[in-house]
From Swiss-Prot:
Pfam families in UniProt: DnaJ, HSCB_C
Stored PROSITE patterns: DNAJ_2
Role description: Co-chaperone involved in the maturation of iron-sulfur cluster-containing proteins. Seems to help targeting proteins to be folded toward HscA.
UniProt record similarity statement: Belongs to the HscB family.
GO biological process, one term: [2Fe-2S] cluster assembly
Subunit structure: Interacts with HscA and stimulates its ATPase activity.
Domain J: 2-74
SUPFAM superfamilies: Chaperone J-domain, HSC20 (HSCB), C-terminal oligomerisation domain
An annotated Gene Ontology molecular function: ATPase activator activity
Transmembrane stretches, start-end: none
UniProt keyword list: Chaperone
Name of this chain's protein: Co-chaperone protein HscB homolog
Record's GO cellular component terms: iron-sulfur cluster transfer complex
Length: 175
């Protein structure tokens, strides 16, 4: 099952989330298990399976990074696992710099300003890299798909680092 076809939307990194949501609700109404309460056990099981598939498809397409990964997998791009090391040494250095920047927040004289700075840097870099990946996905050739795969992994790093920033913020201001 192709998720984009399921929701009758064009294969693209940019998705109209309102259209996606509307299609999702329409599909769920047709297969919702409650509609099959008086059906046979097999029909109920099929309804539950279809509903779960629609939920999975919706969750994948509404999340930009999951959507990008789905598109790349559909294009048979080999997705390295999370443990696979980056070949991009400049990005490895940037990872270390960002982690140091995050660690420095704890020891800053102005924690609020330091946190805002980290959040601003992460947001800016995430948006820039996301735009690059968006272009690469739209180009849809072997080189651009491979580059998009690398950038997707980088964006996942930024996403995880943002979670760490949120946790740090919670720990600093919960006291």
């Amino acid at each position: 099952m192709n998720y984009f076809q399921l929701f009758n939307i064009e294969v693209s990194f940019d998705v109209d989330l309102q259209q996606l949501s509307s299609s999702y609700q329409t599909l769920q109404k047709t297969v919702h298990p409650d509609k099959f309460a008086h059906a046979s056990e097999q029909e109920q099981r099929i309804a539950v399976q279809k509903s779960a598939q629609i939920n999975d498809a919706y969750q994948t397409l509404k999340n930009p990074l999951q959507r990008a990964e789905y598109i790349l997998v559909q294009r048979s791009v080999e997705m390295p696992n999370e443990q696979h090391s980056f070949q991009d040494t400049s990005f490895l250095m940037r990872q270390m710099e960002l982690r140091e920047m995050l660690e420095d927040v704890r020891h800053s004289g102005d924690v609020d300003a330091a946190l805002l700075e980290v959040q601003s840097v992460l947001s800016t870099e995430y948006l820039q890299l996301s735009q690059v990946m968006r272009t690469q996905i739209s180009e849809n050739n072997a080189a651009s798909n491979s580059a998009a795969c690398d950038n997707l992994r980088k964006l996942k790093f930024y996403q995880k680092l943002n979670i760490e920033v949120d946790r740090l913020e919670d720990s600093l201001f919960d006291d």
